[in-house]
């Protein structure tokens, strides 16, 4: 039996999908601005 694929970890979650990580690249900034435009309550993890 294989283990479940999602093993929650808050530090990894922030490092991989967090705001500061998004702002580092041009594509990441585009993601954040698209979510702002759409009116998302939560921009990043």
UniProtKB/Swiss-Prot annotation:
Alphabetic keyword roster: Ribonucleoprotein, Ribosomal protein
MF term (GO), any: structural constituent of ribosome
PROSITE patterns: RIBOSOMAL_L34
InterPro entries membership: Ribosomal_bL34 (IPR000271), Ribosomal_bL34_CS (IPR020939)
Listed GO biological process terms: translation
Top-level taxon of origin: Bacteria
GO CC field: ribonucleoprotein complex; ribosome
Official protein name in the record: Large ribosomal subunit protein bL34
Lineage: Bacteria, Bacillati, Actinomycetota, Actinomycetes, Mycobacteriales
Family assignment from sequence similarity: Belongs to the bacterial ribosomal protein bL34 family.
Protein's UniProt keywords contain Ribosomal protein: yes
